[in-house]
Amino acid sequence: MTQKTAKILVMDDEDAIRTITCLLLEKMGYTSMATPDGETAVEEYRKALVAGSPYDAVIMDMTVPCGMGATEAIKKLKEIDPNVCAIVTSGFASEVNHEELHKQGFSGVLKKPYLSENLRDVLNSLLLF
C-alpha cells in the first residue's frame, strides 16, 4: 500500500512567499498549488473538491491588501467544506490571537517569518496519514 501524498493549497499575495512555501512543501514530499488571494484560493479549493481531488490543507495569509484575506476566505471555505483544514499566516503579532482564530475555523497558525521546521511541525500536527 502506498502512502498518500498530501495536497496543500497556499494563498499569499507575495509572490516570493508563495514560491518559497511551495518549494519547502515539495521538499517535504507534499504536492502544492499557490494562489495570490482568497477569491482565487476559494475557487481553486472548490474546483478540486468537485473534481474529487480535494486539498488536505490550505495555508492562507491573514492580510491581502488588494483582495480577500484569510479571515474572509475561511468563511467561504467552511461553506464549501465544513471540515477544511486551514492554517493562517501573519507577520503582524497583533493579528495572531490563537483562540479567536480557532473560533473562526482555523486549524493552525504560523507566524511569519516561519522556518521550514515550523511549517513541517504545524502540518504534521494537523494531517493524519
Give a label for each model feature.
Residues 12-13, 61, 112:
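Acidic di-acidic motifs
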Residues 19-27, 99:
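Charged docking surfaces used in two-component/phosphorelay signaling
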Residues 34-57:
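Acidic, metal-coordinating helix/loop segments flanking the phosphotransfer/catalytic sites
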Residues 43-46, 69-83:
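Short amphipathic alpha-helix used as the core "switch/output" element in two-component signaling
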Residues 58, 62-65, 115:
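The short loop immediately C-terminal to the conserved phospho-acceptor aspartate in CheY-like receiver
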Residues 70, 76, 101-109:
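As written
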Residues 114-124:
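C-terminal output helix
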